[in-house]
Each structure stands twice: as structure tokens, then as C-alpha cells.
């Protein structure tokens, strides 16, 4: 049996109830927590990796600096923190930060690095992971970019639809269709 991991994308307060709150976010957090709990109950060392948008306060993606987004997930603010319900599953060595450079917009978890400079891809490979279950926010942006990079890099990828939040329902549904066409498994009900 190939080793499986869960990747949690941007389940951060600004995307849940803050400046960029997404549709279905609270429900997605609950579904993600449930999926993680089911995975770790039999295997306490089950890998759960977290991707975090982690911006400096003057990030170029913010409207006030010429970008398209309101300020969000600023370093050392509540908005950039992982939801409390998921914090018990966080291991510092399995957190990957993206968007840390002022002039770089990064959507994919593959662009993030851990505190020790390790990439998501190298970490998954070091753990012997072959299959990845993705949950997170937002389906059309960071979840999509991360899933596509996982697929390109040879991982079997699935998403839990109930554990995804989104900016727009039409974009969410279109992305789920794209996932299925590309070979990503969309789990409709847990």
C-alpha cells in the first residue's frame, strides 16, 4: 500500500472569517478536521502538511500596493493563523509558507518552503508519500495550483469536496470538473 498524506491549504482565519472570507469556509474546516481525525486515529504519525499564505504587510498582491486582493494573511496577525480546530494537528516541520517575498505572488504549495527551507515536494518524497488528499481554501486558486503541481510531480491526488471553500460557486464547480478531467479524484461525500 502506498503511503498517503493530507495537505491542508490555507485554512487561515482571513480566508475563513476575515478580509478574504470564502464561501463554505466554516463547513470546510469542520470537514477537514473530521478527515484528519479519521486518518490519525489509527496512525498517529499520519502526515498532515499545512500550506500557509504568509505575507509581509506591504505585499504586492494587496490592492493598496497595486495588486488585486485586500490585505490578507499578514505575518504575525490573527488573519494569518491556522484555524484553532486544526492546530492540534500542526507540526512545525510540516508547515510550508508561501507569498513571503514582497514582490512574489504564490498560489501553489509547491512554491512554499518550511522554516528549514525544505519544499513541499521534497518533504513528501522524503516521507515516502505517493498519494495526497487535499483540503483547503480557495478551490479556484491555491487549492487548484497545489493539486495541479502535485499531479505534475507524479502524486496520486484526491480532494474532499466538502472540505473545500471557494471564492465563487461557479469557479469552484468548474475547478472540480477540471480536476476530474485531469485525473484528480473528487470525493463528493465523506
Language model features: what each stretch is:
Residues 1-100, 155-156, 167-189:
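Active-site acidic carboxylates
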